[in-house]
């Protein structure tokens, strides 16, 4: 169990993936990184008709609980790729 207010169990990568799949069930999610810095790639129909910025905002708003706070497990998303299938 993490010491972050979200109290997720498992790795940060698993927490990111499960959060995104809860919001976008059809999503194919790839997360890599560590030390608070992560690369995220998401393929989902949820991005259809959205601009790149809108798609990236959707992803970041979905994982904001892992980014915000005094000692967040995610300090930076170094790369974020969003695509439709």
Residue ranges and their predicted role:
Residues 41-56:
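A short interface-forming secondary-structure element
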Residues 60-85:
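C-terminal structural segments of small proteins and small subunits
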Residues 1-12:
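N-terminal presequence-like segments and adjacent domain-start helices
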Residues 30-32, 41-43, 81-83:
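Solvent-exposed beta-strand sheet faces enriched in polar/charged residues
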Residues 37, 56, 75:
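Histidine-centered active-site/metal-ligand motif
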Residues 22-39:
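Short edge beta-strands and adjacent turn/loop segments
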Residues 12-20:
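Short amphipathic alpha-helix segments
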Residues 18, 57, 61:
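Active-site phosphate/pyrophosphate- and oxyanion-stabilizing loops and adjacent acidic/basic residues
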């Amino acid at each position: 169990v993490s010491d972050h207010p979200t109290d997720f169990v498992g790795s940060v990568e698993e927490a990111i993936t499960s959060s995104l799949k809860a919001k976008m069930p059809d999503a194919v999610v790839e997360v890599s990184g560590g030390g608070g810095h992560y690369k995220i790639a998401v393929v989902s129909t949820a991005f259809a008709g959205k601009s790149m910025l809108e798609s990236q905002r959707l992803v970041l708003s979905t994982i904001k609980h892992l980014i915000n706070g005094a000692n967040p497990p995610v300090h930076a998303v170094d790369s974020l790729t969003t695509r439709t299938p």
